Amino acid sequence: MNDLAFLSGLLSELKLAVPWGHIAAKAWGSLKGAPVLCLHGWLDNANSFDRLIPLLPQDFYYVAMDFGGHGLSSHYSPGLPYYHQDFVNEIRRVAAALKWNRFSLMGHSFGGAVGGMFSCVFPEMVDKLLLLDSVPLVLESSEVENVLTYRRRAMEHILQLEASNKPSNVVSPEEMLQGLLKNNSQVGEECGKLLLQRGTTQVATGLVLNRDRRIAWPELGFDFISRELFKKALQKLQARVLHVKASQGFTSVRKETKGNKDTIHFMIDTLQMILKERYQFVEVPGNHYVHMNDPHQVAKIISTFLLSDGAPAPGLPTTA
């Protein structure tokens, strides 16, 4: 399908000032509509939502932001790492810049985990939380033994980058696309091109990646929490939650094991137990990027949820 058809309704590109530069974002819909902040996945960018948002009700105001160091947003100041709480803080800064006191969050993958933490830390600010093949918080589970290794690896990576002071690699558009598809097999070719439109800059001899090379290991970008803290955090949550799981999605990306399965089941059971009718779970066929590869698959589900009030949306199951 022609990408221009998907981009219909785009209102504007935004640049929101932050102490280290700016947060870039793009907006669709009605300025007078209820606001929805859209959060992309790890190493992706705001173009992650280009195919989905035009299929949603256009009387909302959708803003898809680039996290710091991603897309067209400024990189963090030299010497500083990117921690989970910093991305959570970016949501608060964007809300302040847009003068939003209450809004909904829609996050894919890593964006859902950042949005979930924000929704627990600032519960009064979030009306609805939509998780697209994501989890609201990340449990330590089998990763707990590796956390220190992850932190060391990430810190050493930053120090090596600073010491080498090498310029970014310049490659051809085709090489860039094939590199993306090799490292992320669940992104289709057309969607890969869409992400690279915002994720790269054209120079005389090819393309360079826009993202900050300090952002390398997703484990440093997550806050791993205990099951006890998971329960406590959910008790603070005021938002209604729509949890859309892809049948071949997040757990496949994370190399599904018995431990991971148990963790996912614990999360879903706990969400149902604590949030009750405020939690709705839907599984759809597709992979981790189903919202890009097959946006019609999830658009109706999301639209129904956004348009619904306090009661569970008709036609959306509330159990896994």
Please report, for each region that a protein language model flagged, where it lies by residue.
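Alpha/beta-hydrolase fold catalytic core
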Residues: 1-38, 57-61, 100-101, 136, ...
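A catalytic-pocket lid/entrance helix-loop region that shapes and gates access to the active site
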Residues: 132-169
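Conserved alpha/beta-hydrolase catalytic His-Asp/Glu region
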Residues: 163-224
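Catalytic histidine-centered segment of alpha/beta-hydrolase-like enzymes
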Residues: 286-299
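Conserved HGGG/HGGXW glycine-rich cap/lid loop of the alpha/beta-hydrolase fold
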Residues: 26-75
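Conserved serine/cysteine hydrolase catalytic core
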Residues: 199-275, 280-282
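Conserved hydrolase catalytic core segment
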Residues: 55, 61, 100-146
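Active-site loop/oxyanion-hole signature of alpha/beta-hydrolase fold enzymes
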Residues: 6-8, 14-19, 64-106, 300
